[in-house]
């Protein structure tokens, strides 16, 4: 597939997702980095987003809970270019009923080449990167060209 560029803005749209056993870890991470995160637009799956808002006061667009379609909502927004960064603390030691949705979410984040953190270390690397508070160009699939080729 051909690629094109997309600009991630200075004020990023960040999706925050955490499985049940990881919610406390994500909440602690958000609290540690609250001063940086409040400069960005935050979205989250339902329970996670409501917990973050309740504990920090940060404005969070809370979607549905992951098992009820929230992971797929985040994935759709990634495909539409509406999410710039995904922080997803998933639990590798416990299966969840919506494992296919989890795989799909991670696949879409990879297809659309957005920064993804699945653990504390990577989340810290992303938020401490000089790119976090500046605009940056990324390569993404050139969907209009892809579609035009398929419709020939």
UniProtKB/Swiss-Prot annotation:
Pfam families on file: MGS
Highest taxon in the source lineage: Bacteria
GO biological process, one term: methylglyoxal biosynthetic process
Reactions accelerated catalytically: dihydroxyacetone phosphate = methylglyoxal + phosphate
UniProt domain MGS-like: residue ranges: 6-152
Residues of the active site: 71
Binding site for substrate: 19, 23, 45-48, 65-66, 98
Keyword Lyase: yes
Keyword line: Lyase
GO molecular function terms noted in the UniProt entry: methylglyoxal synthase activity
InterPro entries linked to this entry: Methylgl_synth (IPR004363), Methylglyoxal_synth_AS (IPR018148), MGS-like_dom (IPR011607), MGS-like_dom_sf (IPR036914)
Main EC class the enzyme belongs to: lyase
Coiled coil (UniProt feature): none
Record-listed E.C. numbers: 4.2.3.3
Gene Ontology CC: cytosol
Function: Catalyzes the formation of methylglyoxal from dihydroxyacetone phosphate.
Family: Belongs to the methylglyoxal synthase family.
Protein name per UniProt: Methylglyoxal synthase
Annotated source species: Enterobacter sp. (strain 638)
């Amino acid at each position: 597939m051909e690629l094109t560029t997309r600009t991630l803005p200075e004020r990023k749209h960040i999706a925050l997702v955490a499985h049940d056993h990881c919610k406390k870890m994500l909440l602690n991470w958000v609290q540690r980095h609250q001063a940086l995160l409040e400069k960005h637009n935050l979205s989250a799956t339902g329970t996670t987003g409501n917990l973050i808002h309740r504990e920090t006061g940060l404005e969070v667009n809370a979607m549905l809970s992951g098992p009820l379609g929230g992971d797929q909502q985040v994935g759709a927004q990634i495909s539409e270019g509406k999410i710039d960064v995904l922080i997803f603390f998933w639990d590798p030691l416990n299966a969840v009923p919506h494992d296919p949705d989890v795989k799909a979410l991670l696949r879409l984040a990879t297809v659309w080449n957005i920064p993804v953190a699945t653990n504390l270390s990577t989340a810290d690397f992303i938020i401490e990167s000089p790119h976090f508070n500046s605009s940056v160009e990324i390569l993404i699939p050139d969907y209009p060209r892809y579609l035009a080729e398929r419709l020939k």
